[in-house]
Each structure stands twice: as structure tokens, then as C-alpha cells.
Amino acid sequence: MGNQDGKLKRSAGDASHEGGGAEDAAGPRDAEITKKASGSKKALGKHGKGGGGSGETSKKKSKSDSRASVFSNLRIRKNLTKGKGACDSREDVLDSQALPIGELDSAHSIVTKTPDLSLSAEETGLSDTECADPFEVIHPGASRPAEAGVGIQATAEDLETAAGAQDGQRTSSGSDTDIYSFHSATEQEDLLSDIQQAIRLQQQQQQKLLLQDSEEPAAPPTAISPQPGAFLGLDQFLLGPRSEAEKDTVQALPVRPDLPETTKSLVPEHPPSSGSHLTSETPGYATAPSAVTDSLSSPAFTFPEAGPGEGAAGVPVAGTGDTDEECEEDAFEDAPRGSPGEEWVPEVEEASQRLEKEPEEGMRESITSAVVSLPGSPAPSPRCFKPYPLITPCYIKTTTRQLSSPNHSPSQSPNQSPRIKKRPDPSVSRSSRTALASAAAPAKKHRLEGGLTGGLSRSADWTEELGVRTPGAGGSVHLLGRGATADDSGGGSPVLAAKAPGAPATADGFQNVFTGRTLLEKLFSQQENGPPEEAEKFCSRIIAMGLLLPFSDCFREPCNQNAGSSSAPFDQDQLYTWAAVSQPTHSMDYSEGQFPRREPSMWPSSKLPEEEPSPKDVDTEPKSSILESPKKCSNGVQQEVFDVKSEGQATVIQQLEQTIEDLRTKIAELEKQYPALDLEGPRGLSGLENGLTASADVSLDALVLHGKVAQPPRTLEAKSIQTSPTEEGRILTLPPPKAPPEGLLGSPAAASGESALLTSPSGPQTKFCSEISLIVSPRRISVQLDAQQIQSASQLPPPPPLLGSDSQGQPSQPSLHTESETSHEHSVSSSFGNNCNVPPAPPLPCTESSSFMPGLGMAIPPPPCLSDITVPALPSPTAPALQFSNLQGPEMLPAPPQPPPLPGLGVPPPPPAPPLPGMGIPPPPPLPGMGIPPPPPLPGMGISPLPPLPGMGIPPPPPLPGVGIPPPPPLPGVGIPPPPPLPGVGIPPPPPLPGVGIPPPPPLPGVGIPPPPPLPGVGIPPPPPLPGVGIPPPPPLPGVGIPPPPPLPGSGIPPPPALPGVAIPPPPPLPGMGVPPPAPPPPGAGIPPPPLLPGSGPPHSSQVGSSTLPAAPQGCGFLFPPLPTGLFGLGMNQDRVARKQLIEPCRPMKPLYWTRIQLHSKRDSSPSLIWEKIEEPSIDCHEFEELFSKTAVKERKKPISDTISKTKAKQVVKLLSNKRSQAVGILMSSLHLDMKDIQHAVVNLDNSVVDLETLQALYENRAQSDELEKIEKHSRSSKDKENAKSLDKPEQFLYELSLIPNFSERVFCILFQSTFSESICSIRRKLELLQKLCETLKNGPGVMQVLGLVLAFGNYMNAGNKTRGQADGFGLDILPKLKDVKSSDNSRSLLSYIVSYYLRNFDEDAGKEQCVFPLAEPQELFQASQMKFEDFQKDLRKLKKDLKACEAEAGKVYQVSSAEHMQPFKENMEQFISQAKIDQESQEAALTETHKCFLETTAYYFMKPKLGEKEVSPNVFFSVWHEFSSDFKDAWKKENKLILQERVKEAEEVCRQKKGKSLYKVKPRHDSGIKAKISMKT
């Protein structure tokens, strides 16, 4: 599709309506379009055909969007104005280009684009997602008129932000490269400028947010509450348009009631970002997500002030379908470019958080989802939105480019609306996913590889889906609830499933292609204070990490781009695109038959944690896997499908505005209280190495400062979608504690900075194309768990893996992420292997959400100490808690105070005790200052995990059972210890290098090579399992809306019975908890995945089918570097953990040589296999073992040599010579007989067991008299000695043979009996043949006639010759020469003539079957010629002699043998000897007679012996006849055949003649007229 799309787009021209042209025409639009790249690409594919402004059906566009997933991540300003919208014409593109170059994602660009946005998506003809402007800036306070561009209404703050973005932004790179062009470098510069601009805009917006909080009234709560960042599509902007999975996530949150298809009852839990309306309004928002991705760096920068006010303002609630769509479109367009989008996202997130608290949260979710979907949708050009009905076309990647193109860049996979489910459930129609996929093209691409539409894709109308999925509540619980509803439908919202076929795919899927200058501009816009050098440095780091790839390289290594390929120096003029770190399609969530899909990163919520219920972002989680949360119940609005048009968009807008205003006010207050946050946000941005900020500037100090401040206004969340087959863990974001001790957690900015540093990999990590999503979440969630809850939580089985863990998360175990929750909920959430008996380690690098992709500048604040949660240090004699020493460098977080023990766990961590049984080495005592000791190693662990080194906020979880060696403690300065290796992992990965906030999660089971350590800046380790839990789930971190549902109080195991094969049933939901825990995995799944912690995103499906691999716990908003390319199937040193337990039969069984199929080893996302459904029935092992055990096979007897005990060489006595001993040894090894068998055969003359050949070999190798003498002598001498040396095997064998009574005599008689009969018979046959030949040659009539003809013709030829003529006979020697006498014409020989003459004149049967050959047969003559009478005589004499010997031997046996051994030997041998004598005498007489006859025959032919011979030998005589007979027979056959043919012809001729005479042919008279002729013809 890639080539086709490109062609279409080119045909459409610069004015391409879908937004590709928009980028080409308008610089700002270019950025927007680039952000909308997924949509743009899609538009290019199909929409490009339509030409700018053409009203292509939204369905068609959605198809193009989904198809464009190949290039969905590319931002191409040069391309069609797809981002602008199908309605946009070339002029529109030009107009957009006329906008300030810097206006990549700025509010100004959005404002300028507003006129376009004023057109509703439907009017423009674009799908909602397509029309939505990704960077549409919507004032929270200002309601967007249906036709008026809401972006214009953006508050001054938004405008300022936009301006900042514009400054950072650039118009098209200036190169006219097509989206599909492999070589376009200008976009890289654009991306960099966009990032810089986003940074500056972020700072400005953050500052303005405080001011604007009071300025803009909060929009009245409506069914759709804006999601933080949704308005701006910041998540998408930061993350880049999400893959369709992101869109799916966004779509899960319906934005507007008017969303026709998607909007069912889904109410976005978070306030919609600019791209939050994924459904009908999604267009704008879809672009926003892409914008978010583009401005990854900006998200890396903290947006402390971009909070509610701007977020809400930036992204007006899609109250009115048209206005919302336009705003969304602008937001998307702007968001992808402008940091404003990012700023808006935090704002929107905050607003959404507020809204989520309100019933408006549902609306926010819808809006957010719309925003998310927008990035993927071909967002219309800056302001022009063509309202196209949402269409979710399903496209199958058919083109080589699509298949090979890299997965959508992270920009394409920005978190869609936190409400949006990133990947629809398999149950969700793939078409809906496709629509989503188009919105989140990057993710979609991988998904598409896995399936037609890709699980991540969502229809533009994600709002409906979101509404259906979940109530508007913005909490993680809400997301869980929504996920339960929507995700239950199949990963995507039910609406998605329903609308999937027709719903337009969000334009989110396009790749962002941008110049380096654009990226720099965005960075500047986000961080005004950051010098350009830092931005360039940051971009270079991103490239080095492989997150940012030259656009030309993105297609060379489609899905497995090696980070090395991206290591080229950063060039402003170079076109860049985000490396799609997507997981293989199978790694995506797999729930209910759906294969796991890469999920886009989630949106952070702009609201403060307190304000916003921490909505959970649904990361392309199967709906079934999504846990319903209380939010779902509270957000009834989400359940309703709102038609924005029918419901009235004004209400939604008002609600959003009110929410935005509230968020602004709250943010302003927080910022005033904690001004340090604002400062550190930019600092973190600039400091990110691979994130949006330079890592140098980012430090844990920022985190610490923010922690001291108490609560970071927002948290940054980074997500990357990776192709890693292992799993895609979701980002685990730990909300800062209400009172973080020692400022453990910094402000979001600081956190983001730190996380960026931590996350920045030491080297390029991206092996696979991945999407990176940055989310800014101003809010933090600080929820204290009740003692009972905590205690019960400790009893909980491991929570199920987040759906987000594509490859590893349990497909059936949903986990919700709320965009607004972002890092908070993500930190709380940790996905454990679905079927793992032990909690999974954190997601591997490359895991979509958990892995922090290099270049992902997203700084995520480290999780606060579990201060709010009374989590006691895990009492473990083997795992004393290490206390953190001062962290090295500003980046190190101070150690959180050790939380008091959980209720019921009153014992504080005891001093190190002796290692438990089976544990090789107890962990060292905790270092002073460590807040929480590492949990003791699980039973069966050889070595307890080393306690975390000083400076680690949370000790690493103990190695899982079966892990031979616990991971080494993190080096000093490492913020968080690496999680223990998962079961089956032989060696844990080395600890992260100093300065790395979070060590890479241990390799999943079966992964031979541990993933590279996470990039610096990742500051939160997975929480340690609570004590007392068989498989302890990670304790809920502070700020988590709802702790993981512990089993009912006092119940060691949760009530629900485990399904067959499920070791531990899922824990029951806590009382009052809105979302029940996911259903236990299907039988055979092993242990159900641990329930998602509140705020955690949906668990990634652990793998295709139910896999035993645990899902890695979410890191706090950081992306791990992608796994090396070769880790999937190849290069794995260790066997993957099998799904089924090892069977140990009681007996060794016969092997069945079949080809094994293991579901977890599958990499592709082919349709579910029958093996996933088939269950093994119980079988009767006992009967089966009896029948098919190896013992049933008859054992082959060992060689007789093995029966003799072998003694040491020095003790063996060798009496035989070496040669003799070797010969006997060979015989022994060849005999598989027992000595008893041999004795039986010899004594009883039974040849059935021991054949004659074996007896002959034994007889020939029997011990000779002298040898036997020696052996007997040694035996006698050794009897008297105790320690006498034993005989060697050959000697022992010969000695045992000699013990058989009369062995030699008996065997000789037996052998002679057999040979005598054969010899006599042979002699008899030969003598009879000679006699027969002699008689034939003497008296045969044929011979006489032939010889007479020869004589006649010879005399005739020799007539007149006195020497030869008139002969009476001739010597036989002439007979062989007759064939050489030729006729005068050489046509025939004399022999052939004689044969012909004989047959025609003498043989009456010539030519008939009865014809008999007149001469002796050549074969008999030949045999006779080989005989000699001397040989006959010799053989007879030998037989006579042997017969006498046999008689003598038999006599000996008669004399010596005992009576028991006498018979049947005596009787048999006597009879044989008597008959043998008779036969031998008769043959002697026959030989004499035959000899006499032969001599007579030779004399008869007058044959004379040669000189020196007494008589003619049979050889001479019969050789002549043999030769003549052979030649004669050949001629005879030919002539006989010829005669036969002649006779046949004669017979036929006779028949003809007879017929001719008998029949009279009368020629009929025919009429000569015309009628007669005609009749004859007819």
C-alpha cells in the first residue's frame, strides 16, 4: 500500500486533501500533517487520490489512514494536505504554508488553521479522525462553534503557546519529498524544531496556565469530559500519533456524541485532548497525538503550567461535532508539531482529571479518545475539517513497502486519549481496529502485520467506543471499568467493534516525517530556556538511540531497524521520522482469541493527581482484559453513546471549559505552591538525552525537588511500542506521595527529566520500529491504601499483566491506563505474566509502554516512596532491605522512608537471617536508608536477590522461582534496582549502569540475552511483591486511585475457583470496587495474571495464547530500550518456558516423533490456533504405560562378550596369541547367543536357534588341544588361589565351549551331515547333465539334420576342390565359423541361410509356438564345458573320507557321552552315515558311466585330444558346441519370427481372396440430377 499511497498522494499533488499536501503546502500543516502522518499517509494512500478538498468518503479515507500505517509515523510537510483535511485544497495547503514557519504545532498555527477547522469533519468530508486537526488548540473555556474553528477561540495562552510552537515550528522542510520518499531529511529538522518549540510552548503554557486558570471558565461538565492533553492531542503529539492501538485506546473514550459510528455510549474518561475525539471528532485529535509524538522532546520537558487551563483551552471539548472536529483537527495538527499540544495535553489531562471527577469525565474520555484517534486520522489541514463519517476500513498490508516499512514511529503512537483503548479486543471488529489503526498508523502497522486492521487501530469515533466502554470517570478505576466494558468487547471499545467495519480509521496512524529543524523548533517551543545546542544534542541522542530515524532509513529496516541505523549525526535539513519500536503483532495484547498487539503509549492526564481520578489509559487491551473500575460505575455518561450533534456540542464544550478552568485554577495553585516544578520541567526537557530533554540537564534533583514540592503538577509518561516478542509492558508510573519524604519524587518536570536520563540508553537500543509516546500528566494520584486493603493486597495473587504488555500480558486480563493517569497509574500498574506463577519482571526494553525507547525524551518522575501506602518492608530473613545511600549526582533520588509494615504484618524487616533451605546465599543486609527491603527470594531460588544499593527507592523484587541467580543489585546511583529475572531466565541481566534510573527488566523466560538497561531517566522500579503473597503482587503505589483488589479479608486465596490448570484464581475485587478482576485465564493457562493495579494500563497479553511468560510490571512512564533484533526466536540461548507442566511417566515411554508446536514461540499474529482451544483430557496412564513403555519392547540380548564379566586389564590372563584372541573376540561380539543355546543346538542337533553357519564359525574357532590345555591348567591353578587372575574374555569363551559335552565331535558330525548331502546332490546333477548332452549330440534328430545341411552346403561350396570337396564329414571346429561366411552381397551369413533353410524345409512347426530348437541348449552346453571329471572324482573321494571321519567322531560321542546327551545324536547320525555311504557309492558309479559316455561321444564326432592330453576334455568339446548352438539359436529366433509374419500375411491374403470371390460389388445407380448431387452431399 505504501507505493500506491505515495502514487495517489503524488497524483493528488501538493493540494492533497488528506494532509500530506497540507504539510507540503503549509509548514505548520506540514508539521501537523507529519504528526498526522498516519492519517496523512492513509489519506495519501486513498485520500491522496481525492485531491485536496475532495469529499472522499470518510470510509475511504479511514481506509487510507489505516493503510497508510506504513508511513503513518512520517511527518511530511511536502505531502498532500491530508492533515488539513480532505476538504483542504491545494490553495489551503498554500495558505497553511503561508503560516509562520515556526508554527509547527503552535497555537498560532492552530488558530490560523482554525478557519479550516471551522469546517466540521463531516463538512470537509473527512472522517472525524481525518478532519480533526491534531494540534487543534481549543480553549477550554471557549466553546467551539460548530462551524467556527475552535482553535481560533483558543485562549491567549493557547495562542502564545502556539506562537512558541510556531517559533519552534517550521513550515515544510522545503524539500518536496513525498511521504513515501525514502530520502527526505528536512523533516528531521522540523521535528527537532518542533520539539524545541514544544519545549518553549510548554514552558509558556505552564506559566500561562496559572494565569489562565482563572481566566477561562471551566466548561460545564458534559457527557464527554475533556481529557488532559486530549485537547491538544498532547499525548499524541508527544507520543506521536499512536498506532491504531493507541487510537483504539483513544477511541475507547468517546469524545463527542456526534461521533456517528464510534460514539455509542463511550464517554471518554479523560477530557479529550485536541485529538481526543477519535471518533467523528477524532480527526483533529488524531493529529494531536501524532503531534504529541512529534514533540516527544516537549513531553520530555515538563509542562507544569500547561495544565488544566491550557489543556482544556487548547483542546476544546468536542461539544459540537463540527467545531470539535475542527478543534480536534487543529489540535492534532498543532499538537503533533507544537509543544502547545503537549502543553495542552497536560492541561487537558488536568482538566480531564477534573472532568473525570465530574460526570463530564465520560465526555473527556470521549474527547480524549477522539484526540487520540485524531493523530492517526488523516487530520485535515490546519483548520479545515471535512466531516466525513467515521469509517474503519480494514486494509491488509499487501505492498512490500507496507510490510517492510518500519512500524509507526513513536510519534505515530502517542498515547491516544487515555480513554482510548489502544488495541481493540479481538472481539472488536478488525475494521474498527483498522479505523483505529489508521488513527494510530504506527502501531497499526505492526498490528496490521499481525492482522488486517491491527489490534491497535481504532475508528475515528473512539468517543463512542469510549463511551460504551467506560463511564466518563477519569480514574484508573474508571479506565479499568471502561476497559472492562469496552475492552471486553475485544480490546477495542464495543463501539469500535461495532463501527470498526465502517468507522473511519483515525488518521493517527501516519508516520511523522519531519525535518530536524522542525524537531528543534518543537524543542525550542517546549523549552524556551533551552539553548539550541541542547536541543540538537538531544536530537542526536534520540537518533543514536534509534528512536529518531532518517526518513530514508525508516523503510530500509521496516520493523527491525537497528539503533545503529539511526546513529547518523543529527541534521536539521534531514527528514526524520520516529522509529517505530513496535512489537511483533503477536506480541500485542492477545485476549479472547485476539493476538496481542503493540499498543501505543498512553496519554497523561493533565489534571493533578488529586483533581483527576487518574483515569486509566486503555492500551490496546482486549476489552475482556480490561478491568472495570469504580470509575466506570461513576461515569455513567461514558456508558451512553453520545451523538455530539444530537446531544448538543455546546454542552460538552461548556463542561470542558469548566473543567479546564478548574484544572487551570488547580494547576495555578499547585504551581504557586511548587514553583520549582515549572523550573525543573524545562530543565528536564532540555536534559533529556533520548527523551525530549537533554539528559545532562535532567537530574534526579529535579525529581527530588518536585518530590519536596510535594506533588508534581503533572507527570510525564513515555511509552514505546516495541516489536519485542517477549511482551510490551505498560509504563508503570508511580504517583508522588502526598508528602514525599526527602522529596523523593520530583516534580513531573524533574521526574520527566530524571526519567529521560534514566531512560536514555547507553547506546542505540531500538532494534525494532517502535512508537514512542510522551505523556504529560500534571495530576498525580495519591491514594492511601487502607491497612486492610494493603494487607489483603499482600495476599493477592500476582495482578494480571497489563493489556499493554502486548506480547506478555494476559490477553484476557485487561488493564486500563488512563492517559491522564499517565505515569501515576502506570507506575502503580505493573503487569505480571498472565500464566506465571510468579510476578513478572518489569517489561523488557522495547516493551511498548514499559520500555523506554531511546530518544524518547519523556521525563517521568520517579515513583514516590510508598509513603502513602503502609507497605511494610517485606520481612524476609533472606532479603533485608538495603537502604539508599545518597544517590550519586542530582539524578539520584533520596531513599524514601521505610513504610511501616502492613497491618497484620506487624513485623518490620528482620535482620538478615540464615538463608532459607535451598537458598544458596542470603541477601546482604539492607543498606541504611533503604525505604523498602527487597522481598525475600521465592522458594526454590538458589540465591536471594541482592538488596538494592543505596539510592534505590524500592528494592528489586526477589528473583522469581526457578531463577538460578538473582539479578545483581543496581550499581550505586541507580535509582531503581532491576527486577529479578523471570522464571526460566538463566542469568539475570546485569544491573543498570550508574545514573540509570531504572534497570532494564530481566529477560523474559526463554530470552537468552537480557534486554539492554533502560535509558537513564527511568526512575521507578517495579514495586516489590507484598509479603505473605504466594506470588506477591506489587504493592499499590501512592496516588493509585484504587489498590489492587486483594482477596477477601482472611482468605488466603481469592474466592473465585481457579479454572482447571490455574494455580491461583484471580483475586476478587475489593468491596465497592467498580471493576471486577479479570476472569481467570482459561484452563491450562497456569496462574492467572495478577490483577492490574489501579491506574495501570491494560496488561499486555503475555503472548499468543496463554503464555507462562509473566508480563513485566510497568515502569513508571519510561520506555525501555527495544530488545535486540535477534532476541525473538533466534539467538535465544535458553528454552522458553513451556505452557504446560513437565510430565514424568513412571516408566520410560516409547518416543513419538512429532513436530512440537508451542504457542508462546509464535511470533506472527496469525489467527488463533486450534491448539489454544484444545484441552488435554485425562488419560489412563497405567494402561498406557503398560502398552507403550519401552519395557514392552523385547530386549535384545547382549553380545556374548558382555555376559562374561570383564576384569581389569592388569588382572586378566591372556593365554592366546594376539591374533587368535582378536579372532575369538570378534566371534564373541558377533554372537548374540547364550552358551545354553549353543549347547542345546549341539546336543539336540537343533538348528532353529543356532544356524549351521554359526556352528561352523564356532567349530573353526574352537579351542585347539594345546590352547585348551593351557586354559585348563590355569583354571586348575587358579582354584587354589584366592586372588588368582582371571582369564581374558576369549579364553573364557573357549573354555566355556569346551565344557559342552563332545562339542568338537558333535559339531563336526552335524556340519558334515549338512555338507555331505549338498555335495552329493551337486555331483549327481552335473553327471546327469553330461549324460543328457552326450545323448543329444549323438542321437538328436535336429542335430543330425543341421549337421547334414552344413555338410551339404559345405560340399556344394567346396565342389571341385580336391582337398575339401566331396567330404563325408567335417571337424566340429568349423561350426562356430559358419556365421563368419558371408554372402556375395554381404546381406546374410551362411549360418543364417542354413537356419532359414532348415526351418523352411525341415521343420514343419517353423513359425509356430510348437517349434523346437533342434540343438542342445547353449546354457547346458556352457555348464558342461566347465566340468572336469577329475573334479568329480576328487569330490567323491573327499566325501568318502569325511564320511569315514564322521563315523569315527560319532563313535567317540557314543562312547563318551552320557545317556542323557546320547540321543537324538546317536540315532540321527547312524541313519545319516548309512545313507551317506550308499549315496557316495552310487555317485562313484555314475561318474564312471558318464565319463565313458562322454568319451564315446567325442569319438563319435571324431574329436581327437590335443597334444599332451590323454583324452578330449569336456571343456573343448562342449565349448565348440556351445558357441555354434548360441549363434544358431539367435538366427533361428529371427528366422522363426520372420516366417511367422509371412504366414500371417499369407493367411490374410487368403482371406481377402476368399472374400473377393464370394462378394459381388454392385455399384448403385445414382441420379445425375442436381437433387441427387445435393442429397449425396448432405
UniProtKB/Swiss-Prot annotation:
Gene name of the encoded protein: Fmn2
Official protein name in the record: Formin-2
Cell compartments where the protein resides: Cytoplasm, Cytoskeleton; Cytoplasm, Cytosol; Cytoplasm, Perinuclear region; Nucleus
SUPFAM superfamilies the record matches: Formin homology 2 domain (FH2 domain)
Keyword Cytoplasm among record annotations: yes
Residue ranges, annotated region (Disordered): 1-73, 208-230, 244-383, 401-458, 587-634, 714-765, 786-836, 880-944, 1037-1108
Annotated transmembrane regions: none
Topology of the protein relative to the lipid bilayer: Peripheral membrane protein
Tissues of expression: Detected in brain and in oocytes (at protein level). Expressed almost exclusively in the developing and mature central nervous system. Detected in oocytes.
GO cellular component, one term: endoplasmic reticulum
Sequence repeat placement: 919-929, 930-940, 941-951, 952-962, 963-973, 974-984, 985-995, 996-1006, 1007-1017, 1018-1028, 1029-1039, 1040-1050
Important for interaction with SPIRE1, as annotated region: 1571-1578
The entry's keywords: Actin-binding, Cell membrane, Coiled coil, Cytoplasm, Cytoplasmic vesicle, Cytoskeleton, Developmental protein, DNA damage, Membrane, Nucleus, Phosphoprotein, Protein transport, Repeat, Stress response, Transport
Modified residues (Phosphoserine): 89, 459, 489, 493
Gene null: resulting phenotype: No visible phenotype in male mice, but female mice show reduced fertility and produce at most one to three pups per litter. Female mice display defects in asymmetric spindle positioning, asymmetric cell division and polar body extrusion during oocyte meiosis. During early pregnancy, females present normal numbers of implantation sites, but only very few normal-looking embryos. Most of the embryos show developmental delays and gross morphological defects, leading to embryonic death.
Domain FH1: 735-1124
Function recorded in the entry: Actin-binding protein that is involved in actin cytoskeleton assembly and reorganization. Acts as an actin nucleation factor and promotes assembly of actin filaments together with SPIRE1 and SPIRE2. Involved in intracellular vesicle transport along actin fibers, providing a novel link between actin cytoskeleton dynamics and intracellular transport. Required for asymmetric spindle positioning, asymmetric oocyte division and polar body extrusion during female germ cell meiosis.
Biased amino acid composition, Pro residues: 893-944, 1037-1097
Any one biological process term the GO annotation gives: intracellular transport
